[in-house]
Amino acid sequence: MSEQIQSVGRRKEAVCRLYLTPGSGKWLVNGRTLGDYFPRPTLVSAIQQPFTLTDTLGRFDVKATIDGGGVSGQAGAVRLAVARALVQVDETNRKKLREFGLLTRDAREVERKKPGRAGARKRFQFSKR
């Protein structure tokens, strides 16, 4: 496998276009390193989970372009894109990644604010008198 593998991951409003090439484990996220772009260690470990589950950590170089969303949504988008790319690399990875739910797109979105209310569910303060 010497060619570049391309995949897409989405979470909330974030979209990640990811390119996976055989290499030494270098990460480039929007032109920055993984630890620089995602300073929280929990997000970094969540992003690298597909690699650790399939024992491929450090075997691929990753270039990711992320648009939209917040930090958590972007991390989820990268994680899904990595998992999808690893399935393209080797179909036997599918069973393990599916078992841990890494190939399922998280469909939860923000519920819209309703008229006459403070938020999606919250009401304005009720006064009896």
From Swiss-Prot:
One Pfam family named in its UniProt record: Ribosomal_S9
Organism phylogeny: Bacteria, Pseudomonadati, Gemmatimonadota, Gemmatimonadia, Gemmatimonadales
Gene Ontology biological process terms in this record: translation
HAMAP family, sorted: Ribosomal_uS9_B
One Gene Ontology molecular-function label: structural constituent of ribosome
A GO cellular component entry from the record: small ribosomal subunit
Keywords: Ribonucleoprotein, Ribosomal protein
Keyword Ribosomal protein: yes
Record-linked NCBIfam families: PRK00132.1 (NF001099)
Family, similarity comment: Belongs to the universal ribosomal protein uS9 family.
Gene assigned in the entry: rpsI
Name this protein carries in UniProt: Small ribosomal subunit protein uS9
Ribonucleoprotein keyword on record: yes
